[in-house]
Amino acid sequence: MPSLPNESDHQATCSLSLHSDLPYQPSSSIKRKVRKKKKNGAITANVVGTKYEIVRLVTEEMMFTKARDDDETANLIWNDCAVQHEKIAELRNYQRINHFPGMGEICRKDCLARNMTKMIKCQPHEYNFIPRTWIFPAEYTQFQTYIKELKKKRRQKTFIIKPANGAMGHGISLTRNGEKLQAQDHLIVQEYLEKPFLLESYKFDLRIYILVTSCDPLRIFLYNDGLVRMGTEKYHPPSESNLSQLYMHLTNYSVNKHNENFERDETENRGSKRSIKWFTEFLRANDYDISKFWNDISDLVVKTLIVAEPHVLHAYRMCRPGQHPTSESVCFEVLGFDIILDRKLKPWLLEINRAPSFGTDQKIDHDVKKGVLLNALKLLNIRASDKKKNLAKQKAEAQKRLYGQGSMKRLSPASSDWEKQRHTLERRKEELKERLAQVRKQISREEYENRHLGNYRRIYPPEDKLLLEKYEGLLATAFQTFLAGRAASLQREMNNPLKRMKEEDILDLLEQCELDDEKLSGKPTRPKEPRTLSSMPESTQTLKKLKNYSSHSSSNSTGSSSDTEEEEDEKEGKEKKVSYDLEEHKYKSLERSSRIHWKPPLKAARPFSNSSSPSSAASMRRSVSCPRSITALNTQSPTTDQRPFSSRISSTITRPLSGNRTNSLNRSSSSNRVPQSGTSGSVYPSISESRLDHLTKEQEEELTKQTLYALRDMRIRIPGKGVEEITHSHIDEIMDNWTYHKSKVASYWLIKLDSVKQRKVLDIVRTNIRSVLQRIWKVSDVECLHIYRSFNRVFNRLLWNHGQGLWSCFSNSGTSWETIFCKSTEVVTPQQFQCCQRLVQLCKDCLLAVYKYATDSRVAGMSPDWDDSRYLFPVVPQFTMKSSSSGVNCSSSRLPRSSILFNPRHNHY
């Protein structure tokens, strides 16, 4: 049952060994330490707004200095209750306060019910974890209609009635006669879960602690322990005789602590309050699926906070207008989720507390809540230098504004076309650089979080790519649902394709902007020096970078990852920051920097020889574009475990490269290989390094060749059409009458489809290609493949400039996307390049198929709203692959699914 913020909401135990030298004491007997005089550069904490002594103890253990009660400039401000928006607006960038504006949209019972109802209408299968709820008096009529339907079916249900903004179990009652409820009061009526999961015949709920460190971008952490709060009377299904026995039906600590049967125990596995850590072990001992249990809990939490995100982000932006995108969030929040389990162990959300109780009446409260607070403050990364850096940054920005630096000139009405193009290009470059800074800041933040998670784990953004895509889809739906008709700029920002791009993708776009800038300025085009595939040439500049990287990594390979040394450095004031400067020691960053600050290519130097470095002979190098299984070779002959290839596969590839591309493209993976220690895991001294590289290269080429043939066999068709009515004839018909269709396709792609819809069209191709790569390369995560990274760069180029990248492929030249490989240090082989060419052709076919379906549907009157880009695709085109032997077609599913299947092109696949 729900429990109220600000009250002793006592919950279960997890014995964290944070500091065993601080024995548990009841909050009434804890003595506050006398703080020494404030030192310069110390981290200050203003805790006058809390009544919980455990908060003060944790700040002291973190070595924070207690600020004066009236000090509004402290690094940390803690309040038990929600704070006014004006106070958040007045905070400086180095400060942190423990509440977000707008979080009441899920923490008030009536707001939670209202927002969940809206999301259930949009995503009923995803939001099925909250009991059916009505808000009185607004939904009184709907409730009475529901009661009448139950009577017709001769069914009777129990309902729980709560005050809309109540707490601590006050005003809660149960009823089985819904028709007797009155509409005057502001109440929340909810279906009662009659068959809960029981512990020793007692009903219970879980208090899950959640930390939100940022809303822009959203970052959520789940604490791996919490409290199990049990009723104090054995549970029986609700009936007219026991509806008033609240000690049986309610699990609130504030209610049950008054019962004489309430058991206070100093251990975590007995009493009326226990730890979730103990509960997890209990489930494991009884053969329950622990992994599924925690995944369900995490899923519930993330989906609930996705409902809050549009409200919170909008309110936060209103409080902090003009804040730099790379600035740290001044708000964080520790939330208490109250969750109940049914008999099938499915979690159901009861309520969310934005000010969960941090009272410590029992040892279990002290252990769990101290860990929640201590680990949360460590994750916030509050540093003494933040204040000084913030003041310096403010001064620099003030000087910029004073001298007019950093701001772009405005165009006059009389500006020429050249000036307009130049202005658009400069704006694009500024946008890309800003997003690049955000991505690098996010990478730095993630690296810090991974080192200081403690007993937390990050549940958003998740590591699983498919799960992240699902959550991003729900997030987009939430923004469309809750911010419809307002916050247009915020919605445009959420739909910006740059938000989903990685660092290397943004660097590619920046490089393209540099090339466009050169063309616009009339600079001579750079010569494209041919490179020989067999020799794998590398520039002397690249060799120098690689040597510096190797020596640096070897000298820092010991001790750099030691947590104790990091903490010592922090104590000495040497705050370790992850730098992503373009001149960083990492070779990958150096490689990317050469793409932005381009220089004419140097003469190719000889590649490394085994004799040039004594240590390199014993080391094993693995190509970053090849699955790990390829290099796990044994002493057997390489021909024994190679799969046979048909004559078609062994035949030469005859499609020529288009445009100015030549067969000089080589593999970038050779320059990215980093020597590994000779003593690492699976090194086979019987295979020389050159032999291993040769085998790896051969297998990569074979797998790339298989990928190319698989892509050539892919055909797109419109669902609902027979296999004979393959879409290819429709596409040919459009291309034959291109003069007629050109303007219509352009209007459809560039105007009617927004950026989200354009990405959905190309995602049809992307999803099927992922399945092909997973099948051929035998890897589940294709992100590690060099060829897939090349595909991603092509996809991003096709979506560039609001879809102009793909549209330019319909022109006579149609090779503008090839420029992303021209001067990139990541070199592509001819076969990989032909795969990219086939990918572009599939994207063009997919667009024409979607356009054809939209046109036919509109003419037939099947989908009158198809042209409105607000609507989702009613039907998604499918890809088929023909087997050369059987000729049977197998179509993929419509959106990303792990079960997409293709008929194998050859039996040995």
Curated annotation (Swiss-Prot):
Where is this gene product found?
Cell projection, Cilium; Cytoplasm, Cytoskeleton, Cilium basal body; Cell projection, Dendrite; Perikaryon
Q: What is its main location?
A: other
- Residues that, per the record, bind ATP: K162, M168, G169, Q190, E191, Y192, L193, K203, F204, D205, T251, N252
Q: Which domain of life is it from?
A: Eukaryota
EC assignment:
6.3.2.-
Q: Where are stretches of biased composition, namely Polar residues?
A: 532-542, 626-657, 674-688
**Keywords attached to this entry:** ATP-binding, Cell projection, Cilium, Cytoplasm, Cytoskeleton, Developmental protein, Differentiation, Ligase, Magnesium, Metal-binding, Microtubule, Neurogenesis, Nucleotide-binding
Q: Where is this region: Disordered?
A: 517-580, 603-688
PANTHER family, A to Z: TUBULIN POLYGLUTAMYLASE (PTHR12241), TUBULIN POLYGLUTAMYLASE TTLL7 (PTHR12241:SF147)
Q: What does this protein do?
A: Polyglutamylase which modifies tubulin, generating polyglutamate side chains of variable lengths on the gamma-carboxyl group of specific glutamate residues within the C-terminal tail of tubulin. Mediates both ATP-dependent initiation and elongation steps of the polyglutamylation reaction. Preferentially modifies the beta-tubulin tail over an alpha-tail. Competes with monoglycylase TTLL3 for modification site on beta-tubulin substrate, thereby creating an anticorrelation between glycylation and glutamylation reactions.
Indicate the family of this protein: Belongs to the tubulin--tyrosine ligase family.
| Descriptive protein name | Tubulin polyglutamylase TTLL7
Q: List the top taxonomic levels of the source.
A: Eukaryota, Metazoa, Chordata, Craniata, Vertebrata
Q: Which gene encodes it?
A: ttll7
